[in-house]
Regions:
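Acidic-and-aromatic substrate-binding clefts and catalytic sites of carbohydrate-active enzymes
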Residues: 48-53, 71-82, 100-109, 133-137, ...
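Acidic/histidine-rich catalytic cores of soluble enzymes
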Residues: 157-245
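C-terminal segment of N-terminal export signals and the immediately downstream linker at the start
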Residues: 26-64
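Active-site acidic/histidine proton-transfer and metal-coordination neighborhood
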Residues: 15-16, 69, 76, 102-197
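N-terminal secretory signal peptides and thylakoid transit peptides that target proteins
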Residues: 1-19, 25
Length: 289
């Protein structure tokens, strides 16, 4: 009797142990499962010509490719209401739009832009250019002044109910007193509650910055990526995502540990913009990281 009981207990214990081992392995495999992008945005400036020619057909095509969110400022001859309604009809969501800091410092212009953004149900108001001029030869005090301007705009955006973010170019990746890059001054001197960062991976790389190091050092500051590649020529010009030298897999893997929420395809200039938009999303959908 005891022998049978012991055998049954042993078998049950062994089975439970096996189930536990398999469950543990499944959890480990799930934890290690590579991630993929399920939602990918597009900045509509990529398709200026196409939008001017046939904005409805272009948006239908963009939605069919699998894009989910749009960053834009123009309505291409339509009212904001009709543009918004058509976007919803084809399954696209408004995400962001913006102005330069010079425009944003004009209170009436900023408030009008925010009102339009809120009507369109955008989440972000973007500062695309933090300088009152060309942005060349900036010193420490210039970066501190820019940070102060950004904080002020961010405060207005907060009051009106929209998140504010700054978009970088290569101009911010110059050494200044006490810092490897002037961009770090903007990160340290802006209030995270008022100012998020939209990290343009092309401009960071072209400027000599390190996207992965930035994500490691400031994991809570970045909320959006602009995704375009650096080509393989000495000029380091724009190219479609996946065509150039940027290691998006490594960057996105690091981004999993940060506040990054949105990945937005952009290409400032392309010979065949629609092809580039298609190739970029195809590459990003197939990327595992």
């Amino acid at each position: 009797m005891n022998a049978n009981f012991n055998r049954r207990a042993f078998v049950q214990h062994t089975l439970l142990g096996s189930v536990g081992f398999l469950a543990g392995n499944s959890l480990l495999q799930a934890a290690e499962e590579p991630k993929r992008l399920n939602e990918i945005g597009l900045i509509l400036g990529v398709l200026q010509k196409e939008m001017k020619t046939d904005w409805e057909g272009t948006l239908r095509q963009v939605a069919k490719m699998g894009y989910t969110h749009l960053e834009f400022n123009k309505y291409y001859g339509e009212s904001a209401a009709s543009f918004k309604n058509f976007m919803k009809e084809v399954g696209l969501k408004s995400l962001a739009g913006g102005l330069s800091i010079s425009e944003m410092k004009k209170e009436n212009l900023l408030k009008k832009a925010i009102d339009e953004a809120l009507f369109l149900e955008k989440e972000y108001m973007i500062c695309y250019w933090p300088w009152p001029d060309s942005g060349d030869d900036k010193k420490l005090d210039d970066f501190k002044k820019a940070a102060d301007d950004l904080n002020q705009v961010g405060e207005v955006c907060n009051r009106m109910g929209i998140r504010f973010a700054m978009h970088n170019h290569d101009k911010e990746f110059v050494p200044v007193q006490g810092y490897q890059w002037g961009y770090e001054v903007l990160l340290k001197e802006t209030d995270p509650a008022k100012v998020a960062m939209q990290l343009d991976l092309y401009w960071v790389t072209k400027g000599g910055g390190d996207p992965i190091q930035l994500l490691k050092d400031y994991p809570n500051r970045f909320e959006l990526f602009h995704v375009k590649d650096v080509d393989k020529t000495p000029a380091k010009s724009y190219t479609c995502a996946g065509y150039g030298i940027i290691d998006f897999k490594k960057i996105f893997a690091q981004a999993k540990k940060t506040n990054i929420k949105y990945y937005i395809v952009e290409i400032d200039k392309a010979e065949y913009p629609m092809n580039c938009v298609q190739d970029s999303i195809s590459y990003l959908k197939n990327l595992r990281y």
